[in-house]
A protein has these predicted regions:
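Ribosome large-subunit tunnel/peptidyl-transferase-proximal elements
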Residues: 1-236
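Intrinsically disordered, compositionally biased charged tails
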Residues: 1-3, 223-277
Length: 277
């Protein structure tokens, strides 16, 4: 997997942390220095932790697992959405629906409600109900779409979540931890990296920093998924070749059996002829 370089992280502004007075003590191992009242993140540490996260992301993609991407802050929304879509993963960019993970069964009911409304709207008899009812259903559908539209295909709990800004998305992190779902996250100097399984110390406020980290992670997931597809196709090809070989062996055995039967028949005929003589 191709890894980012120190200079790429530097150019993206991944090293800029928060004001020193807002720091979290557990981020101390990842802080390089203080400059003008701001903590500067050690990008060598960022590279090392990103490599760990990318390897784990590759493994999830290779296993065909689902990762839920979470980022509701303004500068992260579009980046999160595009990244998740590129690997066909669910994502949350609006307000986190409380209980999305810990009360997933109830959340699925809301998603099914949205699907039922879609079915009603596509039914020819939909035009027969009153205009007021149609308007109410349309509004209800729009509200559900805003909250659940990006996770409509998430039929079971994700195998992991990726979070941008764990302070803002603390509820998502808490739910994942409660269910022992691994958490990947971009962790800034104001947050606690010890509650995250795969913390990536970096600036979680600048759009370019978020995009740089996220694109690297997603590429690793994508590579894992593509390797999975390649391995499956190779296995299928081997099965076909094995089946063809087996078929050839079977044909040879049938032919040999036919020859043996024919020779045995000739032998029996010769014996009967001798008896008549």
């Amino acid at each position: 997997m191709e890894q980012l370089t120190f200079d790429q992280l530097l150019e993206a502004g991944c090293h800029f942390g928060h004001l020193t007075r807002k720091w979290h003590p557990n981020m101390a191992p990842y802080i390089f220095m203080e400059k003008n009242g701001i903590h500067i993140i050690d990008l060598n540490k960022t590279l090392a932790k990103l490599e760990e996260a990318n390897q784990a992301g590759y493994n999830l993609g290779r296993a065909g697992k689902k990762i839920l991407f979470v980022g509701t802050k303004k500068q992260a929304k579009e980046i999160i959405g595009n990244a998740a879509k590129s690997v066909n993963m669910p994502y949350i960019t609006e307000r986190w629906p409380g209980g999305l993970l810990t009360n997933f069964v109830t959340i699925r009911k809301s998603i099914k409600k949205m699907q039922q409304i879609d079915k009603m709207m596509n039914d020819p008899t939909f035009s027969n109900i009153s205009k007021r009812e149609r308007l109410q259903l349309a509004r209800q559908r729009a509200k559900l779409e805003k909250t659940f539209g990006s996770i409509v295909n998430m039929v079971r709990l994700p195998s992991a979540i990726f979070v941008v800004d764990i302070v803002k998305e603390h509820i998502a992190v808490a739910e994942a931890r409660k269910l022992n779902i691994p958490v990947f996250a971009i962790v800034d100097t104001n947050a606690n990296p010890q509650i995250i399984d795969y913390p990536i110390p970096a600036n979680d406020d600048a759009a370019k920093s978020i995009q740089t980290i996220l694109e690297s992670f997603v590429e690793s997931v994508k590579k894992g998924y593509n390797d999975r597809i390649g391995a499956m196709e190779e296995a299928e090809k081997e099965d076909e070749e094995f089946s063809e070989e087996k078929l050839k062996e079977k044909k040879i055995k049938v032919m040999e059996a036919s020859v043996d039967a024919e020779e045995e028949g000739k032998g029996n005929k010769q014996r009967r002829t001798r008896k008549k003589e």
